[in-house]
Amino acid sequence: MRTASISRRTAETDVSVSIDLDGTGKATIATGVGFLDHMLELFARHGLFDVTIKVEGDLHVDQHHTTEDAGIALGQAVAQALGDKRGIARYADIHLPMDETLSRIAIDISGRPFLVFRTSFRVEKIGQFDTELVREFFQAFAMNAGITLHVETLYGENAHHIAESIFKGLARSLRKAVAIDPREDGRVPSTKGSL
């Protein structure tokens, strides 16, 4: 089974994450940040990952540490669940529409963490959620999952739709990239023999 559980405690947050990469999309999310919960529920559902995330953070300060640390722990859980990455598809991409918005997400489960983030928001907040935290989440996730991640919104107006399109796009492309490719016959998908 490709599962993992991560616990991470700092002076700012206490985070626990579990993931099953071969799940059915069940989500139990409680970060204390409503919009982030919504995005993480979308991530689980569209990735068909079973995900549990609980965060107790310093929300009296702001939502930054909670959002970033959720991304760190989720990324670590994905990396751990992938193990040596034998048999995975490795690469995936998707164009994901959400009403007037279209975003493109591309992933390489390379072991070389990198983020290209070409998405912007016309407003500073979605409800009470700072839109700049969307990038912080993706940065934390990519660095800790050990993936190369390209996120680009080609066009869009509504900030909620833009955020939703890239979270769903991450889920759908990650779902394809972590899928077991029977033609790999259990090999690591790299000429180097390791990722």
Curated annotation (Swiss-Prot):
One of its GO terms (molecular function) is imidazoleglycerol-phosphate dehydratase activity. NCBIfam families: PRK00951.1-5 (NF002109), PRK00951.2-1 (NF002111), PRK00951.2-4 (NF002114), PRK00951.2-6 (NF002116). It comes from the Bacteria. Pathway: Amino-acid biosynthesis; L-histidine biosynthesis; L-histidine from 5-phospho-alpha-D-ribose 1-diphosphate: step 6/9. It is an enzyme of class 4 (lyase). Its main location: cytoplasm. It catalyses: D-erythro-1-(imidazol-4-yl)glycerol 3-phosphate = 3-(imidazol-4-yl)-2-oxopropyl phosphate + H2O. The keyword Iron does not apply. This is Imidazoleglycerol-phosphate dehydratase. SUPFAM superfamilies: Ribosomal protein S5 domain 2-like (SSF54211). InterPro entries: IGPD_sf (IPR038494), ImidazoleglycerolP_deHydtase (IPR000807), ImidazoleglycerP_deHydtase_CS (IPR020565), Ribosomal_Su5_D2-typ_SF (IPR020568). Its EC number is 4.2.1.19. One of its GO terms (cellular component) is cytoplasm. GO terms for biological process: L-histidine biosynthetic process. Keywords: Amino-acid biosynthesis, Cytoplasm, Histidine biosynthesis, Lyase. It is found in: Cytoplasm. Belongs to the imidazoleglycerol-phosphate dehydratase family.
